[in-house]
């Protein structure tokens, strides 16, 4: 089960997902399309969309299961912010992945290197893939 980070959604929308990961990405979108509410906000707030591509992006992300912030995610986010100095948005996304036991798919794996108990998949690294 996977949680997609904002950058992965943008790369997918732009057709920039690595060729070796496209089949996996299609499977994830079919079987396990989950995003944090923060990812949804960041993705739809991205300034790179024109009005037509924004409408397509909105329709695309509506197919995802959006995970809202609950008390467990709140508590984990606070701990990550206090102990790890991680940015708020990344802390919420990381806390969501850990709370729901999901593998976070992101290109920015270094942002999450100090997050305990997180599973991260970077499809842009040579040794990534399922």
What is the role of each PLM region?
Residues 34, 67, 121:
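General small-molecule cofactor/ligand-binding pocket signal
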Residues 42, 73-76, 126-130:
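A short acidic, often aromatic-flanked loop/helix-cap motif at beta-alpha or helix-coil junctions
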Residues 9, 40-43, 74, 112:
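A generic structural signal for short hydrophobic patches within well-formed alpha-helices
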Residues 19, 65-110:
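Active-site neighborhoods of divalent-metal-dependent phosphate/nucleic-acid chemistry enzymes
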Residues 1, 94, 98-130:
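Acidic, PIN/NYN-like endoribonuclease modules and their adjacent C-terminal/linker elements
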């Amino acid at each position: 089960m996977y949680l997609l980070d904002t950058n992965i959604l943008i790369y997918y929308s732009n057709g920039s997902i690595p060729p070796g990961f496209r089949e996996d990405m299609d499977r994830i979108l079919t079987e396990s399309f989950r995003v944090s509410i923060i990812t949804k906000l960041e993705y739809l707030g991205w300034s790179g969309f024109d009005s037509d591509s924004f409408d397509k992006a909105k329709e695309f992300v509506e197919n995802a299961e959006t995970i809202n912030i609950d008390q467990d995610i709140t508590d984990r986010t606070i701990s990550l912010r206090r102990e790890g100095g991680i940015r708020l948005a990344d802390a919420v996304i990381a806390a969501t992945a850990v709370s729901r036991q999901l593998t976070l798919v992101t290109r920015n794996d270094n942002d999450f290197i100090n997050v305990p108990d997180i599973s991260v998949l970077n499809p842009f690294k040579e040794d990534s893939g399922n």
